[in-house]
């Protein structure tokens, strides 16, 4: 609705909550209607419109590139990242798809997390440099370098309260 302008988005959200305006009118709250937002709302189901934009069902079997997903337990959008992981393995059991997941929010997973989230004091072990790990990942796939050390197995998760990482 507001592009990358986070402050504008916050202001629009608060105004929407305060006024009770219908959700499909939220893009007009600040006088700047958004044709993309309206187009998306006109497709509330996972119909052909959305299916053309993302892998769907058997499409996952054709994904034959290494994939690294970094996600967080507190990420309100994590269901999409984990959906792609599950579907990739479902249709391509030999996929080279790795997951790093820990106590991170939506943005925290890509910004090294934070020492506290929703009142929970995050374990020191969980505060990893995800940007550096991403660079290491690219070196691994493009330059034949070693795989990032944290990727012990395909699924790598931080055990909250135990100050440790585990892998499956």
Regions found by a protein language model. Give the residues of each.
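Accessory cap/linker subdomain of secreted extracellular hydrolases
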Residues: 1-61
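Alpha/beta-hydrolase-fold serine-hydrolase catalytic core, especially in secreted/extracellular enzymes
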Residues: 35-39, 43-52, 62-65, 71-78, ...
């Amino acid at each position: 609705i507001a592009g990358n302008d986070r402050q504008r988005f916050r202001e629009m959200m608060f105004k929407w909550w305060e006024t009770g305006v219908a959700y499909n009118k939220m893009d007009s709250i600040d006088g700047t209607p958004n044709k993309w937002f309206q187009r998306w709302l006109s497709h509330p189901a996972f119909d052909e419109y959305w299916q053309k934009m993302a892998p769907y069902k058997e499409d996952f079997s054709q994904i034959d590139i290494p994939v690294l997903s970094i996600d967080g337990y507190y990420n309100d959008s994590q269901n999409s990242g984990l959906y792609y992981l599950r579907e990739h393995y479902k249709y391509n059991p030999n996929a080279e798809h790795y997951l790093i997941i820990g106590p991170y929010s939506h943005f925290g997973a890509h910004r090294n997390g934070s020492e506290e989230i929703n009142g929970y004091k995050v374990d020191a072990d969980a505060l990893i440099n995800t940007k550096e790990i991403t660079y290491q990942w690219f070196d691994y796939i493009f330059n034949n370098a070693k795989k990032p050390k944290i990727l012990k197995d395909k699924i790598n998760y931080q055990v909250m309260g135990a100050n440790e990482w585990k892998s499956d």
